[in-house]
Regions:
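Conserved acetyl-CoA-binding loop-helix of GNAT-fold acetyltransferases
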Residues: 96-111, 131, 135
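Conserved active-site alpha-helix within GNAT-family acetyltransferase domains
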Residues: 125-142
């Protein structure tokens, strides 16, 4: 598996793969969000905005031949001050690469990015992503009660909490 920073051409070249990642991770957008990624072209445009943004970095997870893109790690709202850095992270991947291998890749990306504090905001209904973050070393640092509407397995739209998870990079020599 190869990881590298995405460029604008990648957004279009891998638009079908990006679209599949968002189809696999339907809870990324709440039920009333105006963003609807329902075509590969919309998926490409959505990611292109992050690639072009000055305060974002998009990393792609590719197969060894770079024929397929299996996932994205988006560092957004990157900020630096007084030798410290912070960013919000968004992660999506295709259903073809769930498991221990992808967790190890995400772990390596988070360690290598060099950002001191990384945070994720995940709806409480999205149990799988919350558990992945916890396995990567993220800690629950807060929540926003009844913040986003989602349709549950019974077809009911309800307001769910947003869980805030934070990862603090350890300095060399710390355990």
């Amino acid at each position: 598996m190869i990881t590298r920073k995405l460029d604008i051409m990648d957004c279009y070249m891998y638009r079908d793969d990006i679209f599949e990642c968002y189809q696999t991770n339907k809870l990324i957008f709440d039920s009333q969000n105006p963003i609807k990624i329902n075509t590969p072209d919309i998926a490409a445009e959505f990611i292109r905005d992050f690639v072009e943004a000055e305060d974002s970095c998009v990393m792609g997870l590719f197969d060894d031949s770079k024929k397929f893109l299996y996932g994205l790690v988006i560092f957004d709202n990157i900020r630096y001050a007084n030798n410290k850095s912070c960013a919000q992270v968004h992660v999506v991947n295709s259903k073809t690469i769930f498991g221990e291998v992808v967790r190890e890749i995400y772990d390596n990306i988070i360690i290598a990015c060099g950002i001191d504090t990384i945070y994720a905001e995940i709806p409480a209904i999205a149990v799988f992503p919350i558990n992945i973050c916890k396995r990567l070393g993220f800690v629950k640092t807060g929540y926003i009660p009844e913040a986003l509407p989602y349709i549950n397995s019974k077809g009911q739209e309800k307001m769910y909490d947003i869980i805030i998870l934070t990862y603090k990079r350890r300095k060399r020599g710390e355990t």
